[in-house]
Amino acid sequence: MKHSANEIPARSGAVLSDIPALRKRARQNIEEGAVTTGYAADREAVIRMLNEALATELVCVLRYKRHYFMAKGIHADPVKAEFLAHAGEEMVHADRLAKRLVELGGEPNFSPDGLSARSHAEYVEGDTLNSMIKENLIAERIAIESYREMIAYLAEHDPTTQRMLKEILASEEEHAEDLASLLEGIKG
């Protein structure tokens, strides 16, 4: 197969854009930042989805912080430490989501108005150490399923957002395992 001098053969045999065409496309709509003409996802749907994920992470931060301060009992110290660590990690997730929203030309919705309605997970206070662990585990399981669905929706249409969501998903799975172990330890 012959290629023009400006075409770059890819490993799969597909041909990447010729350099002048690539340069021309990059100059179009430069105010869109990272979102180029090759962005294949429905940007408005992705922004809506990421704002729901942001709300979920923020609700999780608030729940974990409440549980950290309210946990008491003989087993409370290691559980509190886990709650505090998870709250910090969920805030990192929220920050990553907010940053990606801006990169996509959206606005991260940090408004407390409707936060619970936008969140996939619920804010449940819990009144015992056991119930707090269970509620956090349920919320992590909801987040895991939500992120899996988002990742599948994005497919190859937005690899950057998909990669970020896969990293957050891995963290949520670790949180769920941590909480399941804590729950087992308290029962044990």
Regions found by a protein language model. Name each.
Residues M1-G188:
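Iron-associated oxidoreductase/ferritin-like identity signal
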